Amino acid sequence: MRLFLSLPVLVVVLSMVLEGPAPVQGAPDVSSALDKLKEFGNTLEDKAWEVINRIKQSEFPAKTRDWFSETFRKVKEKLKINS
């Protein structure tokens, strides 16, 4: 009975060994992942610089600076008058 059960097990084990290693199925390649990450970083950097340059060229910073200067000047004058 033991021989009768061990022969099929031996056949299955031999077939698995002779079959060889299983093909790689979608194992991520580290270099391609790093390349994608680098590309994402470069894209993000370009977009960030574009936004910064757009803000620098807009009128908003100048208007904000002028508003703060004017408000600060008015507060300063009020404090001088009240003192």
Swiss-Prot record:
GO terms for molecular function: fatty acid binding; phospholipase inhibitor activity. The keyword Transport applies. GO terms for biological process: lipid transport; lipoprotein metabolic process; negative regulation of cholesterol transport; negative regulation of lipid catabolic process; negative regulation of very-low-density lipoprotein particle clearance; triglyceride metabolic process; very-low-density lipoprotein particle clearance. It holds the Pfam family ApoC-I. One of its GO terms (cellular component) is very-low-density lipoprotein particle. InterPro entries: ApoC-1_sf (IPR043081), ApoC-I (IPR006781). Keywords: Lipid transport, Secreted, Signal, Transport. It is found in: Secreted. Residues 1-26 form the signal peptide. Inhibitor of lipoprotein binding to the low density lipoprotein (LDL) receptor, LDL receptor-related protein, and very low density lipoprotein (VLDL) receptor. Associates with high density lipoproteins (HDL) and the triacylglycerol-rich lipoproteins in the plasma and makes up about 10% of the protein of the VLDL and 2% of that of HDL. Appears to interfere directly with fatty acid uptake and is also the major plasma inhibitor of cholesteryl ester transfer protein (CETP). Binds free fatty acids and reduces their intracellular esterification. Belongs to the apolipoprotein C1 family. Apolipoprotein C-I is present in acidic (APOC1A) and basic (APOC1B) forms in P.paniscus, P.abelii and P.troglodytes and perhaps also in baboons and macaques. The two genes for ApoC-I arose through a duplication process that occurred after the divergence of New World monkeys from the human lineage. In human, the acidic form has become a pseudogene sometime between the divergence of bonobos and chimpanzees from the human lineage and the appearance of the Denisovans. Pseudogenization resulted when the codon for the penultimate amino acid in the signal sequence was changed to a stop codon. This is Apolipoprotein C-I, basic form.
